[in-house]
Structures are given as structure tokens and as C-alpha cells.
Amino acid sequence: MEFQDVVRRRRMVRDYAARPVPEEVRERIIANALRAPSAGHSQGWAFLVIEDGADRERFWAAVTTPGEESPWSAGLRRAPLIVVALSHKQAYLDRYAEPDKGVTDRRESFWPVPYWDVDTGFAALLMLLTAVDAGLAACFVGIRPERTADFRAAFGVPDAYRPVGFLTIGYGAPDVPSPSLGRGRRTAEEVVHRARW
């Protein structure tokens, strides 16, 4: 698929067919995430891949409030592949303490924004685009802060890794487009400023 077609087709899909993601496609999705840019080539990310039915149930039990059901979550739960993208701040602080960077005190205030989260988001976007390129559907969703401890406990995730979000991936089923799409995309005239605000 041409890159512009991938970009145009990319949307958040919230319902999936009961069909597994082929292993070679899954591995390509992960491999492309590893190609994401990262400050200082820190690569401060990790990815938790969840495919087994029992593991997926454990995931949903950990990240949702008991008894919480909604039309969108029912469709997401059918995704045969879940990839949690986690950022690792310490990898950046350590990398930038090295001689070629020179931030030896590892101060977080050096960073104008948390690039460990930004770069993990880049990796997640590459996974979304790779899924579309392979003819799959995907959705990026966050884990609510009050559910993070349960998620960590369920999967043994170390405290040094923060879940930036997770992707549900699979073959899309007919789903109801989000009402938010009615807002339309903002135009370049609204958001692009050339040489001055």
C-alpha cells in the first residue's frame, strides 16, 4: 500500500473479527515499532504483547472497572492482539548522562517535555500504520491511572516502566464510527502558522 493511502485509511477501529493476526504480521508490527526515533537513540520503551485468550481476559480485568461494559469496550475486547507501549524514563536519564551528552546529574528538568513518552508514542504510531498497511485495524487507548497498579500486578510490570497506552489490533469488523468524526478535521489554515503566529 502506498504511504499516503496508509495515512488516509488510518482510523481508530473499535470492533474486530474473531480471526488471529498472522505471526509474521505481528512480528512486523513490533519490528517497525523498534524503528521509531528516540532522543539520543535512548530507545526507552518496552512492549507487552498479549495474544492468548486467558491473558487478554486478565488484561481487560486489570484495566477496566469491574462491571464496566460499554458498546466500545465490547468491540475492543474482541481484538486478538493487544500491545501495551511502555516508556522507560531512566533509559533517557542514563543515556544523557553519558559523555557525549553530558547531563551527568541526570536531572529531569533538562527535558522540555517527557521525551520517553513522546518517543513511545512515535513507536505506537508506527505500529498503527503498520497494522493498516497489513490490512488490519487498530485502536490506541490509554490505561486509566487508577487501573495502572492492577495492570502492573497482573503482568509483573516493573515500576520503572509507565504504560503510555495500548493498541488493540486485528481484522476490523463493521463498527459504528465515532460520533466525534462529525467534528471533521481541522484545516491547515486553523492550525498551521507560517513564520509567525
Regions found by a protein language model. Name each.
Residues N32-L34, V83, V103-A153:
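Small-aliphatic-rich amphipathic alpha-helix that forms the alpha element of a beta-alpha
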Residues S42-T120:
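Glycine/small-residue-rich phosphate/adenosyl-binding loop
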Residues V13-R28:
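A short N-terminal beta-strand-loop micro-motif at the entrance of redox/enzyme domains
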Residues E69, S73-I82, F155-S178:
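A glycine-rich helix N-cap at a beta->alpha junction
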Residues S87, I143, Y171:
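Short secondary-structure boundary segments
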Residues F3-V13, V164-W197:
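C-terminal helix-cap and adjacent tail motif
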Residues A33, A39-S42:
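N-terminal structural module
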Residues D15, A46, A137-V141:
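Short catalytic-loop micro-motif centered on adjacent basic/acidic residues
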